[in-house]
């Protein structure tokens, strides 16, 4: 219950403001993994698809939370249906992305790469 409350508070906090990536699609390209993230207009939902790498073909729609870190830099996190957890630190100005994700089998991955609008 506390996690649900916390997620609701984050959602409410951002209800009146939307991040600049809202309504846009981006490609993240890391060494060994490429994915697209399509952010919905609501500032809460995102569709992802891993297009290259060992997890290619994985796709879904998730609810995400976001927090500004610095000018143009955002922490974005979500949990996928298979219980994988993902955290991005995306610098939309510089076009860079850092991803930290844990697979359903609890393998931790740390990736660094590029970010570009499609």
Question: Which residues fall in each region the model found?
Answer:
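N-terminal glycine/threonine-rich, aromatic-flanked beta-hairpin/loop signature
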Residues: 35-67, 103
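Short, solvent-exposed coil/turn segments at beta-strand boundaries
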Residues: 20-22, 38-47, 69-72, 89-97
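Beta-sheet ligand-binding and adhesion/scaffold domains
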Residues: 75-118
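A generic beta-sheet turn/junction motif
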Residues: 30-32, 41, 80
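Tryptophan-anchored aromatic micro-motifs
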Residues: 5, 10-35
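Beta-turn initiation residues at beta-strand->coil junctions
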Residues: 28-30, 48-52, 78, 101
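Contiguous, well-ordered beta-strand patches that form the walls/edges
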Residues: 54-89
């Amino acid at each position: 219950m506390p996690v649900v409350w916390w997620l609701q508070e984050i959602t409410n906090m951002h209800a009146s403001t939307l991040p600049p990536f809202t309504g846009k699609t981006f490609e993240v390209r890391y060494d060994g993994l490429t994915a697209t993230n399509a952010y919905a207009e609501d500032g809460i939902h995102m569709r992802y698809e891993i297009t290259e790498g060992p997890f290619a073909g994985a796709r879904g729609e998730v609810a995400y939370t976001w927090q500004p870190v610095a000018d143009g830099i955002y922490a974005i996190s979500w949990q996928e249906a298979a219980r994988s957890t993902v955290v991005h630190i995306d610098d939309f100005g510089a076009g860079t992305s850092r991803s930290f994700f844990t697979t359903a089998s609890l393998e931790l991955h740390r990736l660094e790469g590029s970010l570009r609008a499609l």
